[in-house]
């Protein structure tokens, strides 16, 4: 029911202190749910899902922590695993910017056979097939015409903005090192 908000939010609204002031909670409270005309009730909530879950988590956690605070206290500190949901100012210099591959590179790379070191999971025809299956549902999505999630967002490079990197979007904006992820995977493998 909330695949997108009908308003763009300020990136700083996702900083821990502002989450605790209920800025995102108030936005969620004020929105009516939207559903596809076909009556289907499921739709992809890539970004809003993390915001909604963070609000629920904060309310059920006995200490009133956000997911970012929980990850820091329960994973980052005990395992010394570099995993952040909301990067602290002191750690911003450690974050590598997200860079989109050019469409031309993706197109030509997709024709390369995987045994020759293709750096994409799918070849051109697999990607085209997936896109063809998505088109009908994209035409019915309720997010059509919705504003961008963030004030000032123009493209994917916006996720490199320090205000975004410091914000908590658990479903789409967690930063980690490979070693940090390996430590968490090792703990999970040992049922820890």
Give the predicted meaning of each segment.
Residues 1-4, 10, 30-32, 59-133:
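Active-site helix/loop module of the DD-peptidase/beta-lactamase fold
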Residues 31-39, 50-51, 161-170:
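Flexible glycine/proline-enriched surface loops and loop-helix/loop-strand junctions
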């Amino acid at each position: 029911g909330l695949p997108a908000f009908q308003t763009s939010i300020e990136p700083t609204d996702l900083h821990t202190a502002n989450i605790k002031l209920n800025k995102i909670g108030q936005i969620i409270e004020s929105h009516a749910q939207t559903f596809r005309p076909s009556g289907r009730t499921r739709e992809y909530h890539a970004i809003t899902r993390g915001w909604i879950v963070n609000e629920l988590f904060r309310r059920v956690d006995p200490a009133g922590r956000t997911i970012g605070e929980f990850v820091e206290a329960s994973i980052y500190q005990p395992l010394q695993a570099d995993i952040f949901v909301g990067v602290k100012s002191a750690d911003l210099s450690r974050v590598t910017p997200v860079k989109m591959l050019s469409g031309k590179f993706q197109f030509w790379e997709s024709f390369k056979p995987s045994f020759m070191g293709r750096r994409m999971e799918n070849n051109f025809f697999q990607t085209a097939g997936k896109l063809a299956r998505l088109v009908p549902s994209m035409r019915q999505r309720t997010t059509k015409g919705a504003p961008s999630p963030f004030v000032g967002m123009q493209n994917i490079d916006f996720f490199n903005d320090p205000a975004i990197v410091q914000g908590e979007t658990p479903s789409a904006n967690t930063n980690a090192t490979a070693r940090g992820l390996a430590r968490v995977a090792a703990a999970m493998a040992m049922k820890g």
